[in-house]
A protein has these predicted regions:
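Peripheral interaction segments used for macromolecular assembly
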Residues: 1-135
Length: 135
């Protein structure tokens, strides 16, 4: 692993695959807290050292490709709710504002921090109701 990229697209990670029986989120719409679709999952990014999914790559309505941390979303695939990815941190339209990657085949630690900060801030400020005091 020395010198190799740690987090890469699934397509660039030989020997890695989704567990049989688990839903494949590629092609699923990404739905925000406002129940609006903001994009479609186009790729899965895996952490080769930890053997886990870290990000979903989403193509937005405007054609941008942005990262969605797996810890900020839920993949749903059943007969009742259909196939979709739910993100409660931001509104669907706010996917357009996610900080992008400098290179399409890798994510730096600094870029990870910016992406996580965007979704983290969304949990507090994405909607007007979240901005007001609870008490």
């Amino acid at each position: 692993m020395d010198g190799d990229l740690k987090i890469v697209p699934l397509a660039a990670a030989p020997g890695f695959s989704l567990v049989e029986g688990d839903p494949d989120p590629r092609g699923m719409p990404v739905i925000g807290v406002d129940d609006a679709a903001g994009g479609t999952v186009v790729e899965i990014w895996v952490d080769r050292s930890e053997h886990m999914i870290r990000y979903l790559e989403v193509q937005t309505a405007a054609g941008r490709r942005v990262m969605l941390p797996i810890t900020f979303c839920r993949v749903i695939s059943d007969r009742v709710h259909g196939r979709k990815v739910i993100v409660r941190a931001i509104r669907g339209e706010q996917l357009e504002g996610v900080p992008g990657l400098r290179r399409p085949d890798r994510i730096t630690l600094f870029e990870e921090e910016k992406v996580m900060g965007y979704y983290g801030a969304g949990t507090l400020f994405a909607t007007p109701g979240r901005r007001d005091p609870i008490l």
